[in-house]
Curated annotation (Swiss-Prot):
Superkingdom of the organism of origin: Bacteria
Gene3D superfamilies linked to this entry: NAD(P)-binding Rossmann-like Domain
Molecular function as annotated in GO: L-threonine 3-dehydrogenase activity
UniProt family annotation: Belongs to the NAD(P)-dependent epimerase/dehydratase family.
GO-annotated biological processes: threonine catabolic process
Any one Pfam family match given in the protein's UniProt record, by short name: Epimerase
Name by which UniProt lists this protein: Uncharacterized epimerase/dehydratase SAR0558
Organism phylogeny: Bacteria, Bacillati, Bacillota, Bacilli, Bacillales
């Protein structure tokens, strides 16, 4: 990868992906795009940026051509809970945007990455140590989009020879960008509330285990997969990824090591709880580890320490300005 275009660059993953790619490949070699302008304090604005609605194929093609991109990371999407509230918009944005991005990759011979998700699984999927290849019958529009997306990426690889690569992300946890519309968002919100208010009301019930990963590990995984030897990639699209599996009570206990008086209550959201119940408790990541060396660095304990320290520092800086 030498010149990279990233869609959805202002999202939770996109923001940090842009920053990391610019560190590695050079600021001027990474074009960030999104449907809206970055805020004044966004790190994304410190380099090339263009407005892009991913459902506008002509505009996407224009940006790829003008930037002379050799790689496209397509991150723009409507997330699980938001997609369930507006399934038609979710289909139009998630699938229409992906088709446009894949067509751009085919037309301009781009290396291509897009994320899938544990949302691609469903009630009939084995819930413990979920295999790489298994039943995928999701019960949400977001999940349907992700399964279709995996199949489309594989189709473009086998039919047109497009170098497509993707991973099934678990819940991603970060202090840089606050969450927006995901089922696993409680695992980010809980840290902000712990620092700022000393208590949190979770919309996901106790005993609900979901796979999670710290954002630094997720960003490293994207870059590692994109730089991996093509000949070693047997799975290619939809690699299982996870670094840890926990429920809200486990996060509470980890936080209480630093904030002993932290309180956790529950007000379960039936929509997001229903989505969570359809996902695995834990997944098998052996293909990712074996084919391209996936090796997450953070567990719940180390992640909790980093999250709390980062939020404390962020609030200190904000209060001093």
């Amino acid at each position: 990868m030498k010149k990279i275009m990233i869609t959805g660059a202002l999202g939770q993953i996109g923001t940090e992906l842009v920053v990391k790619c610019r560190e590695i490949y050079g600021t001027d070699n990474v074009l960030a795009t999104d449907i809206r302008e970055p805020e004044a304090d966004s790190p994304v604005q410190n380099g090339p940026f263009e407005i892009l609605d991913v459902t506008d194929r002509d505009r996407m093609f224009e940006l790829v051509r003008d930037f002379e991109a050799d790689s496209l990371m397509h991150m723009a999407a409507l997330l699980s809970a938001t997609a369930e509230k507006n399934p038609i918009l979710a289909w139009d944005l998630n699938m229409g945007g992906l088709m446009n991005a894949l067509e751009a990759a085919r037309t301009y011979n781009l290396h291509f990455f897009t994320p899938s998700s544990i949302g691609a699984f469903g009630d009939s999927t084995p819930k413990v140590n979920t295999p790489q290849v298994t039943i995928q019958q999701p019960t949400t529009m977001y999940g349907v989009n992700k399964v279709a997306g995996e199949l489309l990426c594989q189709y473009y690889f086998t039919r047109f020879g497009v170098d497509t690569r993707s991973v099934r992300f678990p819940g991603l946890i970060s202090h840089v960008k606050e969450p927006g519309g995901g089922t696993t968002d409680y695992a980010v919100e809980i840290y902000f509330k712990a620092v700022r208010e000393g208590h949190y009301t979770s919309f996901i019930d106790k005993g609900t285990y979901m796979d999670m990963m710290y954002m630094d590990d997720a960003i490293d995984a994207i870059i590692k997969l994109m730089e991996a030897d093509d000949a070693k990639l047997e799975t290619r699209n939809g690699y299982n990824l996870s670094a840890m599996s926990f429920d809200p009570e486990m996060v509470k206990e980890a936080i209480q090591e630093y904030y002993p008086d932290f309180k956790l209550e529950y007000d379960v959201d039936p929509i997001r709880q229903g989505i969570a119940n359809s996902w695995p408790d834990s997944i098998d990541t052996s293909c990712s580890r074996g084919e391209w060396g996936f090796d997450p660095k953070y567990d719940l304990v180390s992640m909790t320490k980093l999250m709390l320290e980062a939020i404390e520092q962020k609030d200190t800086v904000k209060n001093n300005n």
